[in-house]
Design a protein with these regions (language model features):
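A short, flexible beta-alpha/helix-coil linker loop
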Residues: 23-27, 84, 120-123, 178-181
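Active-site-adjacent substrate-binding region
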Residues: 40-57, 64-66, 112-113, 122-171
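His/Asp/Glu-rich mid-to-C-terminal helical/loop segments that flank catalytic regions of hydrolases
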Residues: 36-55, 89-90, 95-101, 136-144, ...
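Short, small-residue-enriched loops and turns at beta-alpha junctions
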Residues: 3-5, 89, 121-129, 160, ...
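Midchain, well-structured core segments that form catalytic/ion-binding scaffolds
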Residues: 1-96, 103
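Conserved short beta-strand edge segments in small beta-sheet-based binding/regulatory domains
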Residues: 107-117
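Redox- and metal-dependent alpha/beta enzyme cores, enriched for Fe-S-associated oxidoreductases
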Residues: 100-108
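Non-cysteine beta-strand/loop elements that form the S-adenosyl-L-methionine
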Residues: 16-18, 171-176
Length: 209
């Protein structure tokens, strides 16, 4: 990220897999045979996700639903999506929304649906708040290196969020990289060196605690 970024808060993250099951039939007599098209169900499900709660329509602390992939056939179709939110209670509501929407679509078409939620990572803020000295010593390392810390919540996850969950408090600092996950991703060598200086300074400070 940009010079000075210091992140102690990230999304709670889940992946949801929504599997629709239809009834295959020859198209010649589909009505008489009760065809239920799983692809149509999957398409309807995605189309009815809240349009003002997608990655491209949100920022800051707003969460979202992000469809990742639709695959399958008339008989079975799978929709995979990311659920993201900084607040745990709001995340539970998002999971409930996915379940309710999936069941509504399945009932409307006369098919079946199975929803599975998989936890990916959790907001590290809750655990980092229990050990304030971790952030304090990191801010001191920034100061000694002449870098003003810019506290921002990260709209994503980090290796640190998973380490924090495992009991190793690990805030995230800038690396000099920009435009992540795009064709124009690039890195500033100057900022990378400054990040390295901070890590070295942090290591020295920690040995004195």
């Amino acid at each position: 990220g940009h010079l000075g970024e210091l992140e102690c808060e990230c999304f709670n993250a889940y992946r949801s897999d929504v599997k629709f099951t239809g009834v295959a039939s020859h198209t010649n007599n589909a009505r008489a045979n009760g065809m239920v098209n799983a692809i149509s169900m999957a398409s309807s499900f995605v189309s009815n996700l809240p349009k003002n709660q997608s990655p491209e329509t949100t920022d800051g602390r707003e969460g979202f639903y992000c469809p990742l992939k639709i695959s399958g056939s008339m008989e079975e179709a799978l929709v995979s999506l990311f659920l993201r939110d900084f607040d745990k209670k709001q995340m539970e509501k998002r999971k409930e929304t996915v379940q309710m929407l999936a069941e509504t679509v399945a009932n409307l078409f006369g098919g079946k649906v199975q929803v599975t939620h998989v936890q990916q990572y959790l907001n590290m803020k809750e655990e980092l708040d229990k050990v304030p000295f971790v952030k304090e010593v990191l801010v001191k390392a920034f100061d000694e290196c002449g870098v003003k810390p810019v506290m921002t919540p990260i709209r994503g996850g980090t290796d640190g969020s998973r380490l924090t969950e495992l009991g190793i408090p690990t805030p995230n600092i800038f690396t000099g990289s920009h435009n992540y996950h795009s064709a124009s991703e690039w890195v500033s060598l100057t900022q990378m060196v400054k990040a390295t200086d901070i890590v070295i300074t942090l290591s020295n400070l920690i040995t004195k605690i």
